[in-house]
A protein has these predicted regions:
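Hydrophobic anchor at the beta1->P-loop junction of P-loop NTPases
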Residues: 21
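Conserved lysine of the Walker
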Residues: 29
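Post-Walker A helix-loop "phosphate-sensing" segment adjacent to the P-loop in P-loop NTPases
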Residues: 38-47
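ATP-dependent small-molecule kinase phosphotransfer cores
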Residues: 46-107, 141
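A glycine- and Lys/Arg-enriched "phosphate-lid" helix/loop adjacent to the NTP-binding pocket
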Residues: 112-154
Length: 203
């Protein structure tokens, strides 16, 4: 939970900040962020799309420069988006490994973070035979599970909101849950207080 998420003070509303969407690969983060943009009026920003637009496809970046180079690009993009006032009302989707970068993790501790939780049964049909995700090679199912187990604790620690994305829940349900949780957290009345205990959003 992010105890440092800024609260309103002196009766004034808290400054608008992006909502950062985290979770494992193939969870559907980008799809949910795009849905929130279309139906709730948020700006849509996707860290991977920013990187691809500037540097080319991610699999090629990994092949030519290695994972550390990609993580440095990723950290730079996250920091850039979070400090850009033009993205103050965005749903900002970041890659599955981004919260594992120490600099990114520290930034996210003071942001409103939503964790899209899924399981292997939900994700497996999306990644079977996928050759475009370098971190999942050569065995996508096994690698996904390994990465998820390694990263899950970090996701849970950072989350102000947890969304249950298992069983292929419709994106409309997830979006409605997310919007309700955002409204709840942004309307907290007490200055300097931590957010309420994160609630798992379920249909």
């Amino acid at each position: 939970m992010n105890a440092q998420f800024p609260a309103p003070g002196d009766g004034l509303p808290a400054p608008r900040r992006p909502v950062v969407l985290i979770g494992p690969m193939a969870a559907g983060k980008s799809f949910l962020a795009l849905h929130m943009s279309k139906f709730y009026g948020y700006d849509f920003v996707d860290a991977d799309q920013v990187i691809v637009s500037r540097h080319g496809v991610i699999s090629r970046i990994f092949a030519e420069h290695g994972e550390k180079y990609f993580r440095d690009l990723e950290a730079d993009v996250v920091a850039e988006v979070l400090r850009d006032p033009d993205h103050a009302d965005a749903i900002f989707s970041v890659g599955g490994g981004a919260p594992m970068i120490p600099a990114v993790r520290e930034l996210l501790r003071s942001e409103l973070v939503a964790y899209l939780e899924v399981d292997a049964a939900t994700v497996l049909p999306r990644i079977s035979g996928n050759r475009t995700r370098p971190m999942l090679q050569p065995d996508p199912a096994r690698r996904w599970q390994e990465l998820y187990e390694a990263r899950r604790g970090c996701y849970e620690e950072l989350a102000d909101i947890t969304l249950d994305g298992t069983r292929n829940r419709p994106v409309a349900e997830l979006g409605a849950d997310l919007e309700a949780q955002i409204a709840r957290l942004r309307s907290r009345p007490a200055a300097g207080s931590a957010p309420d205990r994160p609630q798992e959003a379920q249909a």
